[in-house]
């Protein structure tokens, strides 16, 4: 064990204290799913809707509740933020580029580091929470890893599956 002493300890902790001071003060949130307002986005398949629970995805870290219908898939993509997701209901598959698809069931967790290419499919109707540590962005990629438009990426997705309720 390394002895830091009073000043060594202060030097060790100072960067975290500075970051915490700059972060937005947390607020209390207690919310049930029926009270959330879900909506879709042109950049995401029509079978996915989300509701911001905390934060502002346009400006920084955020938490969103996400619902999707069975067989709903978000094609290969990446985010600038680190993405954490927790399954609440239903089952899904998460596949990292060059990896095998992994099954997620209620209570399951996945972490996709910044710019890590992945795809996500709800194999049954599902709900999950997604936590991002930076503003939300979505970069779709083709089979070779080159960035493509949302329109190109979503052409291969089933046409307007029934929206989840």
Protein language model regions, located:
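Short acidic-glycine-tyrosine-enriched beta hairpin
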Residues: 98-115
